[in-house]
A protein has these predicted regions:
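Nucleotide/phosphate-binding catalytic cleft detector across ATP-hydrolyzing
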Residues: 1-6, 23, 30-397, 451-454, ...
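Residues forming the flavin
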Residues: 7, 12
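Short glycine-rich, Thr/Ser-proximal phosphate-binding strand/loop in the N-terminal lobe
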Residues: 13-40, 415-425
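Catalytic or ion-translocation cores adjacent to nucleophile or general acid/base/metal-coordination motifs
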Residues: 195-196, 414-444
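Phosphate-binding/catalytic loop of phosphoryl-transfer enzymes
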Residues: 389-416
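Conserved structured core elements
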Residues: 402-404, 420-424, 510, 574-575
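Conserved structured catalytic cores and adjacent interaction surfaces
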Residues: 411, 416, 423, 530-539
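A short helix-loop
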Residues: 438-461
Length: 606
């Protein structure tokens, strides 16, 4: 008995299939150790072969492995460049703990300073005094601030709002005997160069009425007609926010926008050392054969470029040569999904296919580890096609789409395209969107969620309600939760179930649908049938997304690898591993493509 092990080392998962002639004996998989193609990853593959040998009670005669190329999926936080708004400055928006409600515009009045002399802006008391917005520096103390505000209001000073540098907005508001908007966690240094400040707080979920209305804002700031366009641009960025602070720069004052101005989506978000800011000369970029493009605008261009168009990725660590690159702009996804602004962040996600190092002999390394002959007879895409065509009903001319963690491989009878960006890119997008670890995002991305209402009730994405099989932890109340490895996995409080569904599907379209269309355009040719294999192919939602991405008359189905071989089917996974096990075997390879609806397949290349 000659048993061949097909070994497929992926970016996230290592899969092994044992075949004895035309019989599929068994399959197994484990997470890939280290970087794909590294010695650690091959050690993990060898250990998996030995584990499957023990499980099946047999010994492998020889093994097959394809040449390996790794895909890097990175998250680059690139705050969106604030639009030009003239003298208007966006100070903050979307603060989590505001106090009170209302809208007010006035001159800054600093509580840690003496009142201005009579007749100057900010002096209160006499009728006609200028409206003021109180400034509470961090460390001033909420009790002291509230006492000072009560005294000012009692003295007739027209203070209609307060801004706090600390996080004591609610504490200050609760100690006032007046209803006025209080916003905390404000960068008061950004207010220093402003002669007028507008503050608005609305109930959670309600839109702004003053700061999102260009006409009202222009009137509040006494803007001339020439600056009406600046108000319109700024107000457009505040759609969907329920609180915000806007300033009017004083003539000749410092420019807060030069160093402090942030987009609404960055409000309250800490910057990491690698973040690029507007005006940075060292921001990430991509380079094709003809041009160099900054990464953020390139995100909108890459889906229209052919696979392999990007040759170099430049980051703070220096330029890196790549065979392909795919990028995803979360801010653009948010706009397309009509998500509330600021809820998806401003990161650009990049998946790049690194060039294979010269002289890499993965078969030799694996042979030393196993003590067996190991051959590289097929590329990964070719092996995946051979394995996928063992699906019952597969046509010999079918186009196989192997969806992996790092790449989307599209393989036709006469050509193949390997496009960077797949499951890991989606995981990174979900993790960045929800601010959760990637390990949790790997479960959250897979399908529908529910919102836990109390201990045992839930609300589903379609609005239906029901009872949980078992009580949820008290900490999960009010949270979205998805099926996890040990029951419900709570993951978010910021989105409704329906909103998260819309965002999740849009992320899948952006990460998989757009990339698949790019790969198919690069490959060219007709689509008589499309077979989906690989780990992500088990995502029922993703199947629907890809169906909508392709022409309506193209039959698209999920592979059932090994379905025409003897032995149990391996399902939608293990296509490359089974294909490697079949490589070079004429009688076994002839079974690829045979099924109830497919006639005999032509002889496979070997």
């Amino acid at each position: 008995m000659t048993i061949i092990a097909g070994v497929d080392v992926g970016n996230a998962t290592t899969e092994v299939a044992f075949l004895d002639g035309t019989r599929l004996l068994g399959v197994d998989r484990v997470p890939t150790r280290g970087r794909k193609g590294s010695v650690d990853s091959l050690r993990g593959a060898a250990a998996l072969v030995r584990r499957l040998e023990r499980r099946l009670g047999c010994r492998v005669t020889q093994a097959r492995v394809a040449p390996l190329r790794a895909v890097d999926t990175t998250t680059l936080a690139i705050p969106a460049t604030p639009p030009a708004t003239g003298r208007l400055r966006l100070i903050t928006a979307g603060v989590a703990t505001p106090g009170g409600t209302g809208a007010w515009a006035g001159v800054p009045l600093w509580l840690d300073r003496p009142l201005p002399p009579a007749g100057e802006p900010g002096h209160g008391g006499p009728p006609g005094a200028a409206p003021a917005v109180a400034m509470v520096p961090a460390g001033f103390g909420h009790a002291r601030a509230a006492e000072r505000l009560r005294a000012l209001l009692a003295g007739g000073v027209p203070v209609g709002a307060a801004l706090a540098g600390g996080d004591e907005g609610v504490l200050i508001f609760n100690r006032l005997n007046a209803t006025l908007p209080v916003i905390d966690q404000v960068d008061l240094a950004a207010v220093a160069g402003c002669d007028l400040v507008a503050v608005e707080v609305r109930p959670p979920g309600d839109p702004l009425t003053l700061l999102a209305d260009p006409v009202a804002l222009a009137a509040a700031f006494s803007l001339p007609a020439a600056e009406a366009g600046d108000a319109a641009v700024l107000c457009r960025t505040l759609v969907d926010f329920s609180n915000a602070v806007v300033g009017r720069a004083a003539p000749g004052g410092p420019d807060p926008g030069a160093s402090r101005e942030r987009s609404p989506g960055d409000a309250g978000r800490e910057r990491s050392p690698g973040d690029s800011t507007p005006g940075d000369n060292g921001g990430p970029w991509v380079e094709t054969a003809t041009e160099r493009v900054p990464l953020r605008p390139a995100c909108a261009l890459v889906p229209g470029w052919p696979v392999g168009a990007v040759r170099t990725l430049g980051t703070g660590d220096g330029p890196v040569e790549v065979d392909d690159l795919f990028a995803l702009d979360l801010a653009e996804v948010a706009d397309t999904a009509t998500a509330r602004r600021g809820r998806l962040g401003a990161a650009a996600l990049v998946a790049s296919l690194r060039r294979m190092p010269d002289g890499a002999d993965h078969a030799a390394v694996l042979a030393d580890l196993l003590g067996l002959p190991v051959h590289s007879m097929l590329s990964e895409p070719a092996a995946a096609r051979l394995g996928a065509l063992t699906t019952p009903g597969a046509r010999p001319d079918a186009v196989v789409v192997d969806l992996g963690a790092g790449t989307v491989d599209v393989i036709a009878p006469d050509g193949e395209v390997v496009a960077a960006g797949a499951g890991d890119l989606l995981t990174a997008a979900v993790a960045e969107t929800l601010r959760i670890p990637r390990a949790a995002a790997d479960w959250v991305k897979r399908g529908p969620c529910l919102r836990v209402d109390g201990a045992q009730r839930f609300e589903a994405e379609d609005g239906s309600r029901g009872f949980l099989d078992r009580p949820a932890p008290a900490a999960a109340a009010g949270m979205l939760a998805a099926a996890g490895p040990a029951g419900l996995l709570p993951f978010d409080r910021q989105h409704s179930p329906a909103e998260w569904r819309a965002i999740r599907l849009r992320l899948k379209e952006a990460a998989f649908g757009a990339n698949l269309r790019r790969a198919l355009r690069t490959l060219g040719g007709s689509l008589p049938q499309v077979l989906l294999v690989g780990g992500p192919a088990g995502d029922d939602e993703l199947l629907g997304v890809l169906l909508r991405s392709l022409p309506a008359d193209v039959p698209v189905g999920r592979g059932s690898v090994g379905g025409t071989l003897d032995g149990p089917s391996a399902g939608h996974r293990y296509a490359a591993a089974v294909g490697l096990g079949l490589a070079g075997r004429g009688p076994a390879a002839d079974l690829a493509g045979r099924g109830p609806a497919a006639g005999p397949a032509p002889e496979m290349e070997r």
